[in-house]
UniProtKB/Swiss-Prot annotation:
Classification via SMART domains: LRR_BAC, LRR_TYP
Species in which this protein is naturally found: Oryza sativa subsp. japonica (Rice)
GO biological process: intracellular signal transduction
Lineage of the species this protein comes from: Eukaryota, Viridiplantae, Streptophyta, Embryophyta, Tracheophyta
Sequence segments annotated as region (Disordered): 1-25
Transmembrane segments: none
Cysteine disulfide partners in this protein: none
Record flagged with keyword Nucleus: no
Record-given protein name: Plant intracellular Ras-group-related LRR protein 1
Secretion signal, residue range per the UniProt entry: none
Gene3D superfamilies, per the entry: Ribonuclease Inhibitor (3.80.10.10)
Length: 352
């Protein structure tokens, strides 16, 4: 094939059809074998005669593939990174569960409506990227087996909920579920003790509240809940002492009041802590007290490029931060969202 020959001349493939480069994701202990067939305008995979058992990185991205044969996946006994983003895939082969060494899977930019249940058998998986698809649900038991998963990115889909087993992904550090149709977040979020970044922005009219457990995410540093329909933040967020970046722009937020929000994270935490210590908040605190962890005071910094409203607005993403009082239209906001601007093959926003 002309494209493959060109890749060989540029050093992407050695004469056996493998690359001798090293992938940044892995420890540079052993030479990795990369088979790069990206950007070759393939509608189907050719017959591969080389030993796929030696391949550790397989890149099939940016083609027109509508399917991947079960037989090919089953031969990838040592693959660590599998990249099939930006194709026309409507499903993944069930044999993907055979990839016991797989650490990074990227299926973004396809036409997937679901992921096979066998994906939970990829117990070494550390990163799962499934953005810009047609996903309406994730496997219910996904989190029960993927104990090594550190990053889950499922933005720009049609998800109404995340699986309840999400709370079992105890190694998770980053969860990106923006631009979906989430009605609520799963129970047991407080179990995600290592979670540092949570993005559930742009679920528009569907997401109306955050669970109390959000305030028990002891490692959380970044939280984006912008462009939803949230009127009040849970009092427990006063306990997020490590939180350094926060955005709630585009919500009809009334608690905390906007004048408190504009004073910065310290003021917002103080307000929510005061609420938690009195009235109904006091009873909630007693119920959750065994799970709370005390930290020393954290002084956050402003995010570069953002406007400081008051001297103590550290960490808040304050650009155009205001209560919309129910005026914001999800259809209008979606016109400006990354779903419309950056989706590889969608010219109109999805409807849930």
């Amino acid at each position: 094939m002309r494209e493959m020959g060109e890749k060989r001349r540029r050093g992407h493939l050695n004469p056996a059809g493998f690359a001798g480069g090293l992938h940044d994701h892995e420890e540079k202990k052993n030479e990795e074998h990369k088979l790069d067939m990206s950007g070759m305008s393939m509608d189907a995979l050719p017959h591969l005669t080389m030993s796929l058992g030696q391949v550790t990185i397989l890149d099939l991205s940016n083609n027109n593939l509508e399917s991947i044969p079960e037989s090919i996946i089953a031969r990838l006994l040592n693959v660590v990174v599998l990249d099939v983003r930006s194709n026309q895939l409507k499903s993944l082969p069930n044999s993907i569960g055979c990839l016991s060494k797989l650490k990074v899977l990227n299926v973004s930019g396809n036409l997937l409506e679901s992921l096979p249940n066998t994906i939970e058998e990829c117990r070494a998986l550390e990163e799962l990227h499934a953005n810009f698809n047609e996903l309406t649900k994730l496997p219910d038991t996904l989190g029960f087996e993927l104990h090594s998963l550190r990053k889950l990115s499922v933005n720009s889909n049609k998800l109404a909920q995340l699986p309840s087993s999400t709370s079992h992904m105890t190694a998770l550090r980053a969860l990106d579920a923006r631009l979906n149709c989430l009605r609520a977040l799963p129970d047991g979020l407080e179990n995600l003790a290592n979670l540092e970044a949570l993005n559930v922005s742009q679920n528009f009219q569907f997401l109306r509240e955050l669970p109390y457990a959000v305030g028990l995410l002891a490692s959380l540093r970044e939280l984006d809940v912008s462009y939803n329909s949230i009127a009040a933040l849970p009092d427990s967020m006063g306990c997020l002492t490590k939180l350094a970046r926060f955005s709630a722009v585009g919500n009809p937020l009334v608690s905390p009041p906007m004048d408190v929000v504009e004073q910065g994270l310290d003021a917002m935490r103080a307000y929510l802590t005061a609420r938690m210590n009195g009235g109904d908040g006091k009873r909630k605190k007693k119920a959750w007290l065994p799970k709370l962890v005390k930290y020393s005071t954290f002084t956050a910094r402003m995010t570069p490029g953002r406007t400081r409203v008051h001297e103590n607005t550290e960490g808040l993403l304050m650009s155009d931060y205001r209560s919309l009082n129910g005026i914001a239209s999800p259809r209008f906001l979606t016109m400006l969202s990354p779903r419309r601007l950056f989706s590889p093959r969608r010219n109109s926003p999805k409807h849930c």
